[in-house]
């Protein structure tokens, strides 16, 4: 068991304060810090702290896969850690995006390999052959767009904006089943000629301004989001797509689960992500990065969903609030130690015998495993190899630990 130092990724939409403050580094950071990767993804592996220096977690897995991963995980996933943990800090909206299914990822990866597109190329869609289901748990209030809203609710929103240019698209939704109508409308907007997009976006923004100015409340969040996106990405078809997606606000501790094909865009906030160990992203707009609309359309799931269905259900299990996700690659829980447990050695068994990544989000604790102990304060992480478990915790103050393990 060792302390784990994450790899920081800097993107323009990140925060100069959130990750730096969380990990106890000087604020503000020199650049916007968007993600802190805690895992063994080849793109940015985390580092194990040793008395004589640091070793990448990726190297440690290659050197001792049996001890690090355990026989059960190796039998299912080979010598690869199947999950990746991230701290995500968004001061600005992220791209409109979705992730492929396992079958789509395998096919897409092979196709791009045959085309000779380098894995590091900015126009590469499939950097690996894995799907990328993901869970996001809010550390602070978190805002997102996710999943196609049921058509009836979208029709109400479009009518509330009172934009005559939207009338033909309301008819398009009305005349078909939900999934077919949403597919037809999204495809029409995302593939429209730029002059048509410019006219429609301008009309929608005018309607959103009028709606907000009227003091109406039912769709105030949706209208304000469209205005924000329109200001940041003028003339982007993603501004129109935002009208079709559920607008979600998460309180700390609440989570959303995004399966393959779920169209989403994170707007702002600080959260914890755990996902299958993949970097496959198909983008459709709201970004200066590579956009591949035909490939995005190929992977999207147009079946409508509700905010309640996107929220990750939870249940209590021992110390943990477990987030129920139907994914073999990962499972996640928030472990909580309160005043009555301070100073006591408390068992924190895991459902599985595989490895664990622990991230302290509040307080401080000693983690006790077979190979020794580590001290965790807020923002610090630990790697618990398969042969280090089960673990025990000794909290020195009220403490919360985010734990990621395999799901199986």
List the predicted regions and their residue ranges.
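Short beta-strand segments in beta-sandwich/barrel cores
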Residues: 255, 356, 363-368
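Short acidic-glycine-tyrosine-enriched beta hairpin
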Residues: 247-257, 262-265, 335, 369-390
């Amino acid at each position: 068991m060792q302390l784990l130092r994450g790899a920081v990724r800097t993107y323009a939409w990140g925060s100069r304060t959130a990750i730096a403050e969380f990990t106890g580094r000087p604020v503000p950071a020199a650049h916007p810090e968007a993600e802190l990767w805690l895992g063994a993804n080849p793109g940015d592996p985390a580092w194990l702290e040793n008395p004589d220096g640091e070793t990448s977690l990726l190297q440690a897995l290659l050197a001792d896969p049996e001890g690090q991963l355990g026989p059960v995980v190796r039998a299912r996933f080979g010598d690869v850690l199947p999950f990746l943990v991230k701290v995500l800090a968004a001061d600005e909206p992220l791209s409109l995006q979705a992730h492929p299914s396992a079958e789509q990822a395998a096919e897409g990866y092979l196709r791009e390999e045959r085309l000779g597109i380098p894995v590091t190329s900015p126009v590469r869609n499939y950097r690996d052959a894995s799907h990328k289901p993901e869970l996001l748990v809010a550390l602070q209030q978190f805002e997102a767009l996710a999943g196609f809203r049921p058509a009836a609710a979208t029709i109400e929103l479009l009518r509330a904006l009172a934009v005559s240019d939207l009338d033909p698209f309301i008819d398009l939704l009305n005349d078909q089943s939900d999934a077919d109508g949403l597919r037809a409308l999204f495809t029409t907007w995302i593939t429209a000629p730029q002059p048509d997009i410019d006219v429609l976006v301008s009309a929608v923004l005018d309607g959103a301004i009028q709606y907000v100015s009227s003091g109406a409340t039912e769709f105030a969040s949706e209208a304000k989001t469209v205005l924000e996106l329109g200001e940041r990405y003028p003339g982007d078809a993603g501004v129109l797509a935002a009208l079709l997606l559920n607008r979600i606000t998460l309180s700390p501790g609440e989570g959303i689960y995004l399966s393959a094909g779920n169209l989403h865009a994170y707007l702002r906030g600080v959260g914890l992500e755990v996902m299958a160990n993949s970097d496959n992203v198909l983008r459709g707009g709201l970004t200066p990065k590579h956009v591949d609309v035909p490939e995005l359309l190929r992977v999207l799931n147009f079946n409508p969903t509700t905010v309640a269905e996107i929220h990750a259900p939870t249940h209590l299990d021992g110390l943990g609030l477990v987030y129920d996700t139907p994914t073999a690659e990962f499972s996640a829980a928030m472990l909580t130690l309160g005043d009555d447990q301070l100073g006591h050695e408390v068992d924190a068994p895991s459902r599985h015998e595989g490895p664990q990544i622990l991230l302290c989000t509040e307080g401080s604790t000693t983690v006790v495993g077979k190979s020794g102990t580590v001290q965790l304060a807020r923002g610090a992480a630990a790697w618990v190899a398969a042969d280090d478990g089960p673990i025990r915790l000794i909290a020195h103050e009220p403490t919360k630990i985010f734990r990621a393990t395999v799901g199986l």
